[in-house]
Amino acid sequence: MGSRTGMYKKDRKMNHFLKKIAIAGALTAVATSAANLPTAKEVQSKMGMGFNIGNSMEVPNNPTAWGNPYPTQALLDSVKAAGFSTVRIPCAWDSHAPGGKITETWLDSVKTVVDYAMRAGLYTILNIHHEGEGGWFQSNIGTSVNSNIDTKMKNYWTQIANKFKDYNERLIFAGANEPGPNINSWTSQHVSTLMHYYQTFIDAVRATGGNNATRTLIIQGLNTDIDKSVASAPVSTFPKDKVSGYLMFEVHYYDPYQYTLMTSQQDWGASEPIQPQYYYGDYQKSSEPKRNAGYNAWGGAVDSKLAGIDHPKEQFAKMKTNYVDKGYPVIVGEFGANIRTPELNGSDLNLHKQGRVQWHKDVVTAAKQYGLTPILWDMGNESNSGYDNMAYIRRQSSPVGKVLETDVINAMRGVYGLGNYVNTGVTHVEDFIGGGSTIPTSSSSAVPASSSSTITSSSAIQPESSSSTTALRTVVSATGVQLHREGNTLYGTGKITLFDMNGNLVRTSGSSAGNTELQLQGLKQGLYVAKCGNKSLKFIAK
């Protein structure tokens, strides 16, 4: 019985492999057309509400350095299941670009996450983020163009755009993050400089051709601040695009700041210190008025507009009048509020949580009313109870993908007419990513989950029989598939190189031609990318 069971499992593994080959062929065969993609307005109409994978891919040098594990298919599927139709992937590039050239391994790493999002059926925004505090671009918006910055903008976006040129309209590029955080007063020269860099971004992407000729692109407001943008960046200042109707505009929303982000008392020149605020809307605490959202230390009273939906409505109405109505769809690329778990407990924490539900619902309601796409900021730091956090979907502990604040998510879902949240689980295989091929609609790449998506490098792996190994090699050669993993062995039709997710070379196969093998025993825990020819394969070593 044991032998028959073993052969049955072997046959099932081979059948599963052949199914994946068939899927790969389908993915490669579905070539995207260079015909015009849907316009920005058409794209935005399907974006619903969105979710940020924050504090991850934008971390300089190492996407796991700030405590979040590398994004997985399980996470992206969970984002979709929670009711989000869009995901924003903040991303670092400069720290992965020695000599100005982005490493191919980092491009493959980013592609892996983009492919996860595509398989989950999500509209996907990929940007150049801040690369640390300020970075090479964000805090360097001067009154004249810096040629080094301009060159980087062109080089990076040319490389990024070429990597993704065949992806469909569900992939969107965003030029920056929050440009100019150090500028208190934007002059026309500052605005002109920023718009010049955006022109470089747009021209670089369009020049790569393919679907990038009409891909939706996003430019950011002045520090993504609503009032600064309205005051100093009207559409007349915008860069020019070769095609009409393919640009979006981005702002962020964290109002009132004392409620959403402030973590310590500040002295801003009022007659009393400015304190963090914990209670919002209908859930304010009468015995602590200074802790209520909208409390004005200069006036000694709560500004009722800041304590309810009137403020986001007023702000988002400005976006509609100044940008949406003039042909530029608007996304609220980030919004969110810290949960005050270190400071509050008991009934105070419950009151705070009730107010959080109302705040998130108010923001999403106002955004939808004025035709904006709201995208929730998530830092993924739910496992750290020592400071305020902004984590809505679990990333750092099991089960990955669990919604942490169901009441908040359900309030947001309700605005879009969705029912209460139900976890639908993982529906995709994670370890088969064809290098160089396009990811079409998610239904084309959905296959049942398999235990083969991870390996345990320290565990004993039953050796493949010589006949099954020969059969596998024959299938690999006959189908043109250049890279596959069985157990703790990679098989390829040329030299195999193995990298960690930061682009460091880990090991290579000895041969550079013909059928090759690479053993995986002894790897440290983590995620790896194997490459053979134009094929890439990502896997997890536990």
Model-derived regions: residue spans:
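Anion (oxyanion) recognition and catalysis
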Residues: 118, 324, 364, 368
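C-terminal outer-membrane/trafficking sorting elements
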Residues: 5-6, 455-542
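Short, Lys/Arg-enriched N-terminal segments with co-localized hydrophobic residues
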Residues: 2-13
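Aromatic-rich peripheral "rim/lid" segments of glycoside hydrolase catalytic domains that contact
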Residues: 342-439
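Active-site mouth of glycoside hydrolases
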Residues: 38-216, 220-232, 383, 395-416
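Hydrophobic h-region of N-terminal signal peptides that target proteins for export
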Residues: 25-34
